[in-house]
Amino acid sequence: MSIFQILMFAATLFFAFQIYHHVQNLEDKTPNNDTDKHGDRAVFATQSLVEEADDAYERGEIGRAKEILEEAYRLEPINPEIVNKLAYVIAKGGDRLKGIELYERSLELDENDDLTHNAIASLYRLERAYERAQEHYLKALEIDERYPQTYFNYGNLLVDMGETEQARKMYKRALELQSDFPQAREALLSLGDKA
C-alpha cells in the first residue's frame, strides 16, 4: 500500500468516525403523534438503548453495540438516528453490504441528510461501486455545498477513478472552506500541487 493509499484510508476512517458522532447528536426526527404511556416508554427505551450502544462502541465492543442497536431498531425501525448508527456499526464490523442496505433505508426516511449520503458513498467507494458513490457525493453537495469533508471525500473517489484534475478541484474547494484541513493539503501535495 502506498503512503497516499494509507492516507486516504485513514481519512475515510476519520470521516466515518465523524459521521458516527454526528449521528449521536441528531435529534429524533420521527413523528410522535402517539402520546400514550406505551409510546413514551418505547421512546425512552430506545434512547436508553442508543446510549448503551454508544457506551459499548466507545469501549471498543462493536459486537455488543450492534446487538443493542438491533434491539433499538426492532423497537423503532423508522428512526433515522438508530438506522444510521446500526448501519455504521454493522459496516465497521465488516458487513459493508448490510451497512449500505441500512443507509439506503435511512435515506428512504430522510433523503436530505448529507451525512448519510456521505457515509453510503464511502461504503460504495470501498466496494468499488464508483458510480454509485459519485451519485451520493453529488447529492450530498447538492444538500450542503459548504461542508469541506464532502469535497475531500469526493476528491478521494475521483483519484480512485483516475480523474486527478477533478480531484485537485475538490481538494482545493475543501481547503477554501476549511483552511486548516491537513488531509486535503496532503492529498494535493501527493498529486504534485503546492498546497
Regions from the PLM with identified roles:
Residues E71-A72, R105-S106, K139-A140, R173-A174:
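Canonical positions in the second alpha-helix
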Residues T46, P80-E81, D114-L115, P148-Q149, ...:
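Helix-start (N-cap) detector for alpha-helical repeat units in TPR-like alpha-solenoids
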Residues A56, I68, V83-I90, L102, ...:
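TPR/Sel1-like alpha-solenoid repeat signature
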Residues D36-K98:
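Alpha-helical segment of the N-proximal tetratricopeptide repeat
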Residues M1-A45:
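Long, contiguous interaction/recruitment modules in multidomain scaffold/adaptor proteins
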